[in-house]
């Protein structure tokens, strides 16, 4: 399993809306994530800085990256772009984080 972590931003006035849209997440998006080998996906909110910290375990980078081209992912990005900064393709602006410590 490959552990990944990344950080995103959420608009200051959209914390509750961001959480509402994820609870529950669309069943078809959950299915696509699982079918592409995503496990233990969690997102945490830092309210003070409007930051989202996400962690996920994946089976392969190729399968993880393929999620972006699915119809449901494209629709999800459009659904979320009004509550967080987005790239021109509607994907959330994000930065991958380097793991510097892990205790199993």
UniProtKB/Swiss-Prot annotation:
Its EC number is 5.1.3.32. The active site is at residue 22. Disulfide bonds: none annotated. It is found in: Cytoplasm. Pathway: Carbohydrate metabolism; L-rhamnose metabolism. It comes from the Bacteria. GO terms for molecular function: L-rhamnose mutarotase activity. Its main location: cytoplasm. Signal peptide: none annotated. Substrate binds at residues 18, 41, 76-77. GO terms for cellular component: cytoplasm. It comes from Citrobacter koseri (strain ATCC BAA-895 / CDC 4225-83 / SGSC4696). InterPro entries: Dimeric_a/b-barrel (IPR011008), L-rhamnose_mutarotase (IPR013448), Rham/fucose_mutarotase (IPR008000). It catalyses: alpha-L-rhamnose = beta-L-rhamnose. Belongs to the rhamnose mutarotase family. Homodimer. One of its GO terms (biological process) is rhamnose catabolic process. Involved in the anomeric conversion of L-rhamnose. Keywords: Carbohydrate metabolism, Cytoplasm, Isomerase, Rhamnose metabolism. This is L-rhamnose mutarotase.
């Amino acid at each position: 399993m490959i552990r990944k972590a990344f950080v995103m931003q959420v608009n200051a006035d959209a914390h509750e809306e961001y959480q509402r849209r994820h609870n529950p997440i669309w069943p078809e998006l959950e299915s696509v994530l699982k079918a592409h080998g995503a496990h233990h996906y969690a997102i945490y909110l830092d309210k003070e800085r409007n930051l989202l910290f996400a962690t996920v375990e994946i089976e392969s980078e190729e399968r993880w990256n393929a999620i972006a081209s699915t119809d449901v992912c494209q629709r999800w990005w459009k659904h979320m772009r009004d509550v967080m900064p987005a790239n021109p393709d509607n994907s959330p602006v994000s930065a991958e984080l380097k793991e510097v410590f892990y205790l199993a």
